[in-house]
């Protein structure tokens, strides 16, 4: 066993590429993440009370779930759990989703991004830095897999859905200073799957998109699933879908189901919204992401 791995090697792009295999937890940042204030957030904790919750994340990580090489399609998805940017619902909106994607022949990477919200920063600011960094690191790692990465998407629930939207619309502006050569790789997702995404509407008017959401023709296609009785209004998903259509982005799909509430993840219910994984799979097939 080798113990003498230097810190520089541990965070080098070469080491990342070699070690990005199933079950490997990769730190995003070589040291403190950008903008972190030592002592602002307490020790990381994991709590299970019906829902497995992770809180106080200061050292964000990626956990790789690689599909069997006989099934692998070359498509990879970064998965972002929800939790109001306060905690992470890491199991039913994270680990379980990665395993489902593996069944489709899709590599999955679970992003444990920074929570809770940092003082004097937008709620999505630190998580967006983590997501942009993750996009580049996964692209680098995917070059060394038996089935090399060809398409990289992002999927998220609630606050994680907001993070998926922000990542898919903010790629033109990397929100941190370059760390290493991996940051030369694109942070633009090839597709996005926001599920009951939160915080999309302007806080003042509640009838238009938040001003920091910038939809252009360069945005990737989106798949949305939401419910009409969700406490997070479906209007945000609808407005982004319409903006994508207006911008000329092809291939997006929107589902608004009448019932189902919020926070269901992959859990089966009696409501039609439980069909969203099948609809998402069909959408991915229509874009040839599962070929």
Question: What is each model feature region?
Answer:
Residues 223-226:
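Short beta-strand/loop motif that positions the catalytic acidic residue
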Residues 91-109:
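Short amphipathic alpha-helix adjacent to the substrate-entry channel of hydrolases
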Residues 89-90, 96-97, 113-149, 270-273:
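Catalytic nucleophile-loop/oxyanion-hole region of alpha/beta-hydrolase
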Residues 129-217:
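Primarily recognizes the serine-hydrolase "nucleophile elbow" in alpha/beta-hydrolase
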Residues 73-82:
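Short beta-strand element of the alpha/beta-hydrolase
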């Amino acid at each position: 066993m080798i113990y003498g791995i230097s810190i520089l090697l541990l965070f080098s792009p070469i080491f990342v590429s070699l070690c990005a295999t199933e079950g490997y937890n990769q730190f995003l940042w070589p040291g403190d993440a950008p903008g972190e204030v030592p002592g602002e957030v307490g020790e990381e904790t994991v709590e299970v009370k019906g829902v497995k919750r992770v809180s106080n994340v200061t050292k964000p990580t990626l956990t790789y779930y690689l599909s069997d090489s006989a099934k692998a399609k070359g498509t990879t998805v970064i998965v972002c759990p929800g939790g109001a940017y306060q905690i992470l619902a890491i199991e039913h909106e994270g680990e379980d989703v990665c395993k489902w994607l593996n069944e489709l022949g899709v590599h999955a990477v679970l992003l444990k991004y920074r929570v809770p919200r940092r003082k004097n920063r937008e709620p999505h600011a630190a998580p967006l830095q983590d997501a942009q960094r993750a996009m580049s690191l996964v692209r680098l790692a995917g070059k060394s897999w038996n089935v090399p990465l060809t398409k990289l998407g992002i999927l998220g629930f609630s606050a994680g859905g907001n993070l998926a939207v922000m990542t898919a619309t903010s790629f033109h502006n990397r929100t941190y200073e370059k760390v290493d050569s991996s940051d030369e790789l694109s942070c633009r997702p090839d597709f996005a799957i926001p599920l009951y995404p939160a915080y999309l509407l302007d806080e003042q008017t509640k009838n238009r998109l938040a001003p920091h959401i910038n939809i252009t023709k360069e945005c990737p296609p989106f798949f949305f699933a939401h419910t009409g009785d969700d406490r997070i209004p479906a209007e945000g998903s609808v407005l982004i879908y319409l903006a994508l259509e207006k911008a000329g982005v092809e291939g997006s799909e929107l589902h608004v189901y009448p019932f189902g509430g919020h926070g269901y993840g992959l859990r089966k219910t009696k409501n039609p919204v439980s069909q969203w994984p099948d609809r998402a799979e069909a959408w991915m097939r229509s874009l040839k992401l599962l070929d």
